[in-house]
């Protein structure tokens, strides 16, 4: 019976651990996909300061509306 409890207590991860996108260390479940709160906050800071941006082509910025509205 004790062996059954031990086998049931083992938890299998749903996905393989991936490296942290900031520093390359193995990711932590609590801070996924980062390894620590420090790396998570560093990434958030880059988003908030505009360091990350989605490039937009010039012709995409001038949207043409069928009704002539802007």
Curated annotation (Swiss-Prot):
List, as start-end ranges, the regions of compositional bias called Basic and acidic residues: 1-15
Q: Which residues bind Zn(2+)?
A: 20, 23, 35, 39
According to the record, cofactor stoichiometry and binding are noted as: Binds 1 zinc ion.
**Which cofactor(s) does the record list?**
Zn(2+)
Please give the residue ranges the record annotates as the region Disordered.
1-22
User: What Pfam family does this protein match (any one)?
Assistant: YacG
Q: Name the keywords, alphabetized.
A: Metal-binding, Zinc
Gene Ontology terms, MF aspect:
DNA topoisomerase type II (double strand cut, ATP-hydrolyzing) inhibitor activity; zinc ion binding
InterPro entries for this protein? DNA_gyrase_inhibitor_YacG, Znf_NHR/GATA
User: Which GO BP annotation is one of this protein's?
Assistant: regulation of DNA-templated transcription
The answer to whether UniProt assigns keyword Chaperone to this entry is no
Q: Which residues form a coiled coil?
A: none
Q: Which family does the entry's similarity section mention?
A: Belongs to the DNA gyrase inhibitor YacG family.
What function does this protein fulfil?
Inhibits all the catalytic activities of DNA gyrase by preventing its interaction with DNA. Acts by binding directly to the C-terminal domain of GyrB, which probably disrupts DNA binding by the gyrase.
The entry describes its oligomerization and partners as: Interacts with GyrB.
Recorded protein name is: DNA gyrase inhibitor YacG
| Designated gene of the protein | yacG
């Amino acid at each position: 019976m004790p062996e059954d409890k031990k086998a049931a207590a083992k938890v299998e991860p749903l996905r393989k651990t991936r490296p942290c996108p900031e520093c390359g260390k193995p990711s932590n479940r609590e801070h996924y996909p980062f390894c620590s709160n420090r790396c998570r906050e560093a990434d958030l800071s880059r988003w908030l300061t505009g360091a990350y941006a989605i490039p937009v082509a010039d012709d995409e910025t001038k949207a043409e509306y069928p009704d002539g509205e802007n």
